Amino acid sequence: MKCPFCGQLDSKVVDSRPDKGGAAIRRRRECESCGKRFTTHERIEEVLPLVLKKDGRREPFDRLKLIAGIQKACEKRQVSRETIERLVDRLEARLPELGEKEVPSTTIGEWVMTELHDIDEVAYVRFASVYRSFKDVNEFMSELQDLLKK
């Protein structure tokens, strides 16, 4: 494993334990060159369905892209990185359960909105404003009205 501090490839594992939820292994490593320690996470590489975009393109599911989009919606909100990671873990676990080779991006977007609604309503509205591409203020206000009714 390449050391993030000095770039050398030799490191040794000094501690290894299951991550929360057991979906990954957290490893504490020590660089044999500079002696600094760093953490890595190892997870099973699953074959996930392709994401079918609104314009018809297909692309591989990108966990980091999804995390980045959710983080943007949660900016300056009391939503931790860990909460976002768990949200994406739940969504990622649902993908193989569909049993499909492709999943529409709209399905993933709706799942994110459902999760965000329960976590932080402001983040939900921010995500919805980008995801739903509101045409005007009236559409945006309609979404807010629906949120207030719930």
Curated annotation (Swiss-Prot):
Q: What are the ATP-cone domain coordinates in residue numbering? A: 49-139
Q: Which UniProt keywords apply?
A: ATP-binding, DNA-binding, Metal-binding, Nucleotide-binding, Repressor, Transcription, Transcription regulation, Zinc, Zinc-finger
This protein's cofactor list reads:
Zn(2+)
Record-level GO BP terms: negative regulation of DNA-templated transcription
Gene Ontology molecular-function annotations: ATP binding; double-stranded DNA binding; zinc ion binding
| Record carries keyword ATP-binding | yes
Say which domain of life the source belongs to: Bacteria
Metal-binding among keywords: yes
ZnF regions (unnamed) run across 3-34
According to the record, cofactor stoichiometry and binding are noted as:
Binds 1 zinc ion.
Q: List the PANTHER family.
A: TRANSCRIPTIONAL REPRESSOR NRDR
Its annotated function is as follows:
Negatively regulates transcription of bacterial ribonucleotide reductase nrd genes and operons by binding to NrdR-boxes.
Q: Which family does it belong to?
A: Belongs to the NrdR family.
Protein name (record): Transcriptional repressor NrdR
Q: Which organism is it from?
A: Geobacter sulfurreducens (strain ATCC 51573 / DSM 12127 / PCA)
